[in-house]
Amino acid sequence: MSNYKTSEHYGHALSHIHDTGFAGVAEAAADMLISTLKASGLTRGRVTDLGCGSGILARKLLDQGYAVEGIDQSVAMLALAKSRAPEAVFRRESLLECEIPPSIAVCAIGECFNYRFDRNNDEAALDRVLHRVHQSLEGGGIFLFDIATPDRIMKAPPKQFYQTQNWTTLVENIHSETPLMITREISSFVRAGEYYERVDETHHLRLIDPDT
């Protein structure tokens, strides 16, 4: 086994794992969004995907005739997205500070508003993002998002384990009540020929109370 290293957030190894092992969330969100758009009579137009990841949602939207603009901070994720959905426009920017173009829909799937990849992620920053989303949406537009809430402290198991033939991922969830946060210590082992490469990442998620 090779020496391990600490990666950027969603570096090459974890981006590959997320893309191949956890596509279901983005696929389900895309199906829900497409169904809602069509039911609303919105069959053409731009969808802005905040935290677009590897472009799974973008691909499905493009296949239905929508234009897509995706924004993410991970170089590795954006490389996957550009390969999967070359017709889309992708930008590497902070979700907290990016410009959001006029859109018939904006989506932010995968708890991207919770991640503290940008240290400026706080209630004021989230308020500003939501204001920009509101300004960007055309009449009748749709905003689809998810967030991790404080009850995640009770729901998230202390440790999680995922494995395929080509990779193994171990996740330790560390809870904090002051402030309300979850820290995920992620160790990934990815097959590289006859060996496995270990890559560690630490993700901090600010838990958001929807009632505040």
Question: Where do the PLM segments sit?
Answer:
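A short acidic, Gly/Pro-enriched loop at the edge of an enzyme's catalytic core
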Residues: 96-106
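Class I SAM-dependent methyltransferase SAM/SAH-binding core
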Residues: 48, 54-97
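SAM-dependent methyltransferase
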Residues: 144-212
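Conserved class I S-adenosyl-L-methionine
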Residues: 1-42
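A short glycine-rich, Lys/Arg-flanked "PGG" loop and its adjoining helix->strand segment in the class I
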Residues: 124-139
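Non-membrane alpha-helical structural segments and their capping/turn regions in soluble enzymes
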Residues: 27, 75, 120-127
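A short SAM/SAH-binding and catalytic strip from SAM-dependent methyltransferases
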Residues: 104-124
